């Protein structure tokens, strides 16, 4: 019947590995290009890696693409990535291990442009984000007992941001600011 047309052969034979892997290291991410194995039933290529904060990530690319983009890296350093070819029977190849060394996440560049200005009942902030990455600015204020209280969270992907934190007492206060990205990478903290 017609249903036979849609049945596929299930096997237990692992596909071959990808080959000729090329690494393009960028800010907070890596693009890998490779030669796909000659497999009739190739489903996808999957990359597995562990971020600096211990989070395990997995990214996949279809059998019709010879590249995969890996995101979420914080500080630039060496990481190991395992690439697997996966067939339509969900058999995995042996891992093809690649060493990558992405540059620091763009949040660190944004952090270095942060400027603070006193404002009545608050503080004005200015920063530059030329790559228009999604960033989160966290702002804290020191309480009278010496503890730090979170007072504001600002989400932005603007190339140039001018923001203000208002509604605070019009008296001198100590502030602290940091940036994080959507992968929970954090910059150092700037104290004012």
Predicted regions and their residues:
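Beta-strand-rich modules
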Residues: 1, 70-96, 161-191
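Recognizes extended acidic, P/S/T-rich segments that occur
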Residues: 42-76, 140-170
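Short, small-residue-biased leader/transition segments that mark boundaries at the very start
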Residues: 2-6
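Conserved aromatic anchor
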Residues: 28-40, 121-133
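Surface-exposed, proline-enriched loop/turn segments that connect beta strands in immunoglobulin-like
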Residues: 17-21, 111-113
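Solenoidal tandem-repeat scaffolds enriched in leucines and small polar residues
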Residues: 123, 130-181, 185-191
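Proline/serine/threonine-rich low-complexity linkers at boundaries of modular beta-sandwich domains
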Residues: 7-16, 98-107
């Amino acid at each position: 019947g017609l249903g036979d047309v849609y049945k596929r052969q299930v096997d237990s034979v692992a596909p071959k590995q990808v080959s000729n892997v090329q690494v393009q290291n960028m800010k907070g991410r890596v693009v890998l290009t490779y030669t796909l194995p000659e497999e009739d039933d190739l489903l996808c290529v999957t990359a597995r890696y562990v971020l600096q904060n211990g989070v395990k990530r997995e990214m996949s690319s279809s059998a019709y693409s010879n590249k995969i983009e890996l995101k979420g890296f914080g500080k630039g350093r060496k990481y190991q990535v395992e690439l697997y070819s996966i067939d339509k029977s969900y058999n995995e190849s042996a891992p093809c291990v690649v060493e990558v060394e992405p540059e620091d996440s763009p949040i660190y560049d944004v952090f270095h442009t942060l400027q603070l200005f006193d404002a009545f009942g608050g503080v004005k902030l200015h920063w530059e984000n030329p790559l228009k990455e999604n960033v989160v600015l966290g702002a804290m204020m020191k309480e009278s007992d010496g503890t730090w209280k979170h007072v504001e969270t600002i989400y932005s992907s603007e190339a140039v941001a001018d923001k203000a934190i208002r509604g605070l007492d019009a008296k001198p206060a100590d502030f602290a600011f940091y940036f994080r990205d959507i992968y929970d990478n954090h910059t150092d903290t700037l104290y004012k």
